[in-house]
Amino acid sequence: MKALLIVGLLLLSVAVQGKKFQRCELARTLKKLGLDGYRGVSLANWVCLARWESNYNTRATNYNRGDKSTDYGIFQINSRWWCNDGKTPKAVNACRIPCSALLKDDITQAVACAKRVVRDPQGIKAWVAWRNKCQNRDLRSYVQGCRV
């Protein structure tokens, strides 16, 4: 009985953690979903962004006390502007999706929303982590050995 309980708890913890991509697995997935070169943003920039925003974790969330918004998913897309979580005041929901869609292991909707973000005038600069960790850096290591 104890063993069954332990197995159940382990399965629950895996379900809560979501999918944590490996670097090359993410690079291949993003390429397949059309992010390589989208709006002039290289695949290496997208992988770098995901590394520093979520550590490649689809279930990452971060609450922002200042404006009471939350960042969701592998790209940490914000509920103030891009998705609806039902609790962020004055949310815009420009991607027209529930924020929960950004937490799925299948990142198709997260990629579609990220494409929407970079179509705005700020482009990829909308992400602070990209500006701080990826901008003007040699990013080849993010796709090196990935055969993409």
UniProtKB/Swiss-Prot annotation:
GO MF term (any one): lysozyme activity
EC number(s) per entry: 3.2.1.17
Leader sequence segment: 1-18
Residues at the active site: E53, D71
GO biological process, one term: killing of cells of another organism
Keyword set, alphabetical order: Antimicrobial, Bacteriolytic enzyme, Disulfide bond, Glycosidase, Hydrolase, Signal
The reaction(s) this protein catalyses: Hydrolysis of (1->4)-beta-linkages between N-acetylmuramic acid and N-acetyl-D-glucosamine residues in a peptidoglycan and between N-acetyl-D-glucosamine residues in chitodextrins
Disulfide-linked positions: C24-C146, C48-C134, C83-C99, C95-C113
InterPro entries: Glyco_hydro_22, Glyco_hydro_22_CS, Glyco_hydro_22_lys, Lysozyme-like_dom_sf
Pfam families: Lys (PF00062)
Biological role stated in the UniProt entry: Lysozymes have primarily a bacteriolytic function; those in tissues and body fluids are associated with the monocyte-macrophage system and enhance the activity of immunoagents.
Family, similarity comment: Belongs to the glycosyl hydrolase 22 family.
Protein name: Lysozyme C, milk isozyme
Organism: Bos taurus (Bovine)
